[in-house]
């Protein structure tokens, strides 16, 4: 009895090992069958393009190019019922089992494309670049505009390559550059000559630039400016008057004094400043000093204006004097 109880664990261990081997064998067999099933399905999927397609039932052959399947096969290895694709809008270019045709490609003009070959039931639309556009990629989804050359063309633009342009050649500008260098010296000479002539004309004395009789020319340098001070002051700005008198002997202290005495009246400041200068300078050559001083300060227009006023007045006085003398001679 004791021996039986001793052998029982050994028997149970053997049974467990035997059952384990059986289970492993079954699992291995199931895995092997699963692999074989996947292999069969893969083979069937591959054969879809070769003549068999499983969709409900197996169809023996695909629909030819330009057609699509109208309905599923009802019997294994039956012939499919195929109908044509819509001409000009759809196509299929190889045998297939699909119930749909492919949509024809559109050639987008906005991307530089145009139709080369129209779409048929068995062939998709073929696009190409429009004139003056190119595409250098294998599949053209868009075309780029050809480059426009400024300095000449090496190679014209084609459907597959851009224009090759000549680079700007500095030597082409050489003749123009030489011509410009030849023209510069005479142009500079003419400009300088005119500037010198203008400068000489501006620096001429009042009696040199205007044709006067000898008597008027002599008296112009000694003309009494006191009666013209107000007119001259009215033609000048305060800063111009200050600048002139400062350069011609009037001290800063005197300028400040006149300013403080006439703080609210700039017109009176100008008159008093010019009177003070005239008193310091004296009558002799005062007119010439005033005219030349204004021209030196680049106030030629103002100098000519003042000179014209004085000259007109002197000429009028001279004519009146001559008229009086003629009357006396007649008497």
UniProtKB/Swiss-Prot annotation:
<dbReference type="Pfam" id="PF00020">
    <property type="entry name" value="TNFR_c6"/>
</dbReference>
<dbReference type="InterPro" id="IPR008063">
    <property type="entry name" value="Fas_rcpt"/>
</dbReference>
<comment type="subunit">
    <text>Component of the death-induced signaling complex (DISC) composed of cell surface receptor FAS/CD95, adapter protein FADD and the CASP8 protease; recruitment of CASP8 to the complex is required for processing of CASP8 into the p18 and p10 subunits. Interacts directly (via DED domain) with NOL3 (via CARD domain); inhibits death-inducing signaling complex (DISC) assembly by inhibiting the increase in FAS-FADD binding induced by FAS activation. Binds DAXX. Interacts with HIPK3. Part of a complex containing HIPK3 and FADD. Binds RIPK1 and FAIM2. Interacts with BABAM2 and FEM1B.</text>
</comment>
<keyword id="KW-0472">Membrane</keyword>
<feature type="disulfide bond">
    <location>
        <begin position="129"/>
        <end position="143"/>
    </location>
</feature>
<dbReference type="InterPro" id="IPR033998">
    <property type="entry name" value="TNFRSF6_death"/>
</dbReference>
<feature type="disulfide bond">
    <location>
        <begin position="104"/>
        <end position="119"/>
    </location>
</feature>
<dbReference type="GO" id="GO:0097192">
    <property type="term" value="P:extrinsic apoptotic signaling pathway in absence of ligand"/>
</dbReference>
<feature type="disulfide bond">
    <location>
        <begin position="63"/>
        <end position="82"/>
    </location>
</feature>
<dbReference type="GO" id="GO:0006955">
    <property type="term" value="P:immune response"/>
</dbReference>
<keyword id="KW-0677">Repeat</keyword>
<keyword id="KW-0325">Glycoprotein</keyword>
<keyword id="KW-0597">Phosphoprotein</keyword>
<dbReference type="GO" id="GO:0043066">
    <property type="term" value="P:negative regulation of apoptotic process"/>
</dbReference>
<dbReference type="GO" id="GO:0045121">
    <property type="term" value="C:membrane raft"/>
</dbReference>
<dbReference type="GO" id="GO:0097527">
    <property type="term" value="P:necroptotic signaling pathway"/>
</dbReference>
<feature type="lipid moiety-binding region" description="S-palmitoyl cysteine">
    <location>
        <position position="196"/>
    </location>
</feature>
<keyword id="KW-0053">Apoptosis</keyword>
<dbReference type="GO" id="GO:0032872">
    <property type="term" value="P:regulation of stress-activated MAPK cascade"/>
</dbReference>
<feature type="topological domain" description="Extracellular">
    <location>
        <begin position="26"/>
        <end position="171"/>
    </location>
</feature>
<dbReference type="Pfam" id="PF00531">
    <property type="entry name" value="Death"/>
</dbReference>
<dbReference type="InterPro" id="IPR001368">
    <property type="entry name" value="TNFR/NGFR_Cys_rich_reg"/>
</dbReference>
<dbReference type="InterPro" id="IPR033999">
    <property type="entry name" value="TNFRSF6_N"/>
</dbReference>
<keyword id="KW-0449">Lipoprotein</keyword>
<dbReference type="GO" id="GO:0009897">
    <property type="term" value="C:external side of plasma membrane"/>
</dbReference>
<feature type="repeat" description="TNFR-Cys 2">
    <location>
        <begin position="84"/>
        <end position="127"/>
    </location>
</feature>
<feature type="region of interest" description="Interaction with HIPK3">
    <location>
        <begin position="209"/>
        <end position="313"/>
    </location>
</feature>
<comment type="function">
    <text>Receptor for TNFSF6/FASLG. The adapter molecule FADD recruits caspase CASP8 to the activated receptor. The resulting death-inducing signaling complex (DISC) performs CASP8 proteolytic activation which initiates the subsequent cascade of caspases (aspartate-specific cysteine proteases) mediating apoptosis. FAS-mediated apoptosis may have a role in the induction of peripheral tolerance, in the antigen-stimulated suicide of mature T-cells, or both.</text>
</comment>
<feature type="repeat" description="TNFR-Cys 3">
    <location>
        <begin position="128"/>
        <end position="166"/>
    </location>
</feature>
<keyword id="KW-1003">Cell membrane</keyword>
<keyword id="KW-0112">Calmodulin-binding</keyword>
<feature type="disulfide bond">
    <location>
        <begin position="107"/>
        <end position="127"/>
    </location>
</feature>
<dbReference type="GO" id="GO:0006924">
    <property type="term" value="P:activation-induced cell death of T cells"/>
</dbReference>
<feature type="disulfide bond">
    <location>
        <begin position="85"/>
        <end position="101"/>
    </location>
</feature>
<feature type="domain" description="Death">
    <location>
        <begin position="226"/>
        <end position="310"/>
    </location>
</feature>
<feature type="modified residue" description="Phosphothreonine">
    <location>
        <position position="211"/>
    </location>
</feature>
<keyword id="KW-0732">Signal</keyword>
<keyword id="KW-0564">Palmitate</keyword>
<feature type="disulfide bond">
    <location>
        <begin position="59"/>
        <end position="73"/>
    </location>
</feature>
<feature type="repeat" description="TNFR-Cys 1">
    <location>
        <begin position="47"/>
        <end position="83"/>
    </location>
</feature>
<keyword id="KW-0812">Transmembrane</keyword>
<feature type="modified residue" description="Phosphothreonine">
    <location>
        <position position="318"/>
    </location>
</feature>
């Amino acid at each position: 009895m004791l021996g039986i109880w001793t052998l029982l664990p050994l028997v149970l261990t053997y049974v467990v090992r035997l059952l384990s081997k059986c289970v492993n064998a079954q699992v291995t067999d199931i895995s092997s069958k699963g692999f074989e099933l996947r292999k069969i399905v893969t083979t069937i999927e591959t054969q879809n393009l070769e003549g068999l397609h499983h969709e409900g039932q197996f169809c023996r052959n695909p629909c030819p190019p330009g057609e699509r399947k109208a309905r599923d096969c009802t019997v294994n290895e039956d012939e499919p019922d195929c109908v044509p694709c819509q001409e000009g809008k759809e196509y299929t270019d190889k045998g297939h089992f699909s119930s749909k045709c492919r949509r024809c490609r559109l050639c987008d003009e906005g991307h530089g494309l145009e139709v080369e070959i129209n779409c048929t039931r068995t062939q998709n639309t073929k696009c190409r670049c429009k004139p003056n556009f190119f595409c250098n990629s294998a599949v053209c989804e868009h075309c780029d505009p050809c480059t426009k050359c400024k300095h000449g063309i090496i190679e014209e633009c084609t459907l597959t390559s851009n224009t090759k342009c000549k680079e700007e050649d500095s030597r082409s500008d050489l003749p123009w550059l030489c011509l410009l260098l030849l023209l510069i010296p005479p142009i500079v000479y003419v400009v300088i000559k005119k500037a010198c002539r203008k400068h000489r004309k501006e620096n001429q004395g009042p009696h040199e630039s205007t044709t006067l009789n000898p008597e008027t020319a002599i008296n112009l340098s000694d003309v009494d400016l006191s009666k013209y001070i107000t007119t001259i002051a009215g033609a000048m700005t305060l800063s111009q008057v200050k600048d002139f008198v400062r350069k011609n002997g009037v001290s800063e202290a005197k300028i400040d004094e006149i300013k403080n005495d006439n703080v609210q009246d700039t017109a009176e400041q100008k008159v008093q400043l010019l009177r003070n200068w005239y008193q310091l300078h004296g009558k002799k050559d005062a007119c010439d000093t005033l005219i030349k001083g204004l021209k030196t300060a680049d106030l030629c227009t103002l100098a000519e204006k003042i000179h014209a006023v004085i000259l007109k007045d002197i000429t009028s006085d001279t004519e009146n004097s001559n008229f009086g003398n003629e009357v006396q001679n007649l008497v």
